[in-house]
Regions:
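Iron-sulfur cluster-binding electron-transfer modules in prokaryotic oxidoreductases
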Residues: 1-262
């Protein structure tokens, strides 16, 4: 994977919330904004944004994916970074949007320029903002043992597994547990879980059993698709495995939740 050059910390940024965050886990979007604003950024949310087109693309419908992606290209007109709280959606925008419009003399340059400004959340926090969370005023939070789940796209396409690890490991009171099936897919895979439910179900059962064997308090991930899949399966099985988006976890463990309640 080509090593990426990171820009200086900006004053403003866009949020591409993703459709799963918007519909199912809006708290993750709010906490992403809070994390960025606490670092001094003005965060902009273009209201016309929708899906990144990945479901259509991964189902073999590139024309539908092009239609969805084309509607987004002019929404992020300013030269600000586009922050995505999902490695899967960030990977689609950064790596596949330019391919979708490679033969389009108008949309192609736009897609390529936008892709260069797309950052997965943990990548942006660590390498662009270079965050050093101030936890000096955080007291009374119990220690936690967590499992960090990195989605397949985040791990293999965006290469952001180590970014999430670095952020979690920097938090006092947090023990990150590794497990045997850490690098395996959770079975979601977008439309894969719909097309192959039996295989998907077996994969997520393996993931849950392996994570629970560590005795962790919760599973943390930066991808809502994985969280929805693992969380639903764990509840269905009665497995003691709460799930939480990385943005919400970071905000909560660095005092954000306490400040809201004060």
């Amino acid at each position: 994977m080509k090593q990426r050059r990171y820009p200086p910390a900006p004053a403003q940024a866009y949020l591409f919330a993703t459709c799963l965050v918007d519909v199912f886990v809006p708290q993750a979007g709010l906490d992403t904004v809070r994390l960025l604003e606490r670092e001094g950024l003005a965060v902009h949310f273009p209201r016309g944004q929708s899906c990144c087109g990945q479901p259509a693309y991964s189902s073999g419908n590139p024309e539908q994916a092009r239609t969805v992606a084309l509607a987004q290209l002019d929404l992020f007109a300013e030269p600000w970074p586009v922050i995505v709280p999902s490695g899967s959606c960030a990977g689609m925008m950064r790596h596949h949007w330019p391919q979708l419009f490679a033969d389009d003399p108008v949309a192609g340059p736009k897609a390529f320029a936008l892709a260069e400004r797309v950052f997965e959340l943990s990548e942006f926090l660590l390498h662009v903002l270079k965050v050093r969370f101030d936890v000096s005023g955080v007291a009374g939070q119990p220690p936690e043992t967590v499992v960090l789940h990195t989605s397949c796209a985040a791990r293999r396409e965006m290469g952001t597994r180590d970014h999430g690890v670095a952020l979690v490991d920097a938090l006092p009171g947090i023990t990150r547990a590794e497990h045997q099936r850490e690098s395996e897919c959770c079975g979601f895979g977008g439309t894969f879980s719909l097309k192959h439910p039996d295989i998907s179900g077996a994969m997520v059962q393996d993931k849950i059993a392996s994570a629970c064997a560590t005795g962790c308090d919760r599973l943390v991930s930066a991808d809502c698709g994985c969280l929805l899949n693992i969380g639903h399966a764990a509840r269905h099985q009665g497995a003691p495995l709460p799930v939480e988006h990385l943005a919400t976890f970071l905000w909560r463990r660095t005092g954000g939740g306490a400040k809201e309640q004060a």
